[in-house]
Amino acid sequence: GYTPKDGSCPSENTLISVVAGGVYNKLNNNVNPSSGSVLRFGSEQFLPIGENAPTFNRLRASYSRFIPVRLINFTKECKSDVSANNDCFQTIGFQFKTGTILGELPPYESFCMGGSSSVRGWGSCELSVSKSFAEVSAEYRVPLWRMISGSLFADAGSDLGSQNDVPGKPGKLLDKVGSGFSLGGGIGVKTP
């Protein structure tokens, strides 16, 4: 069976990591974008110090695109024919994220899918514990009243069949489904 002494998950590891990444940002606003796109990619190389420590590389990439629209006119700024798009902040956003781990993957460094920064509507790490993943999201944001805004979203994600590639197969042991989707909405309040 799987135990910490079988080499796949030693009771103690000492690792150092070297991180490299890049961003190509064409967003009109980094905090609350309504148009433009951003491409992010990164690589984190883990190197062992001592015995029984794994060597592996975590690769991640994401692409987000925001398109300004005017579909619903709840606020005064959105009802005006002369207001600019930034007075009537509405946007449709799309995001694609992916990642994989190359090398000797320790289970505690696996990708967890599900949660508020992953596939919303699922609990944190509720969908999968995997070596690779892909997620896609679409969201519509609209101002409702003064500082209150609303959003509708659709998220989906998959472990790309890689839960079995994690030593000890924690995703399978915990009955993680490996892929899923969600539809939902939310209310936000902008604060100064």
Model segments located where?
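C-terminal transmembrane beta-barrel domains of outer membrane proteins
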Residues: L15-V18, S35-P192
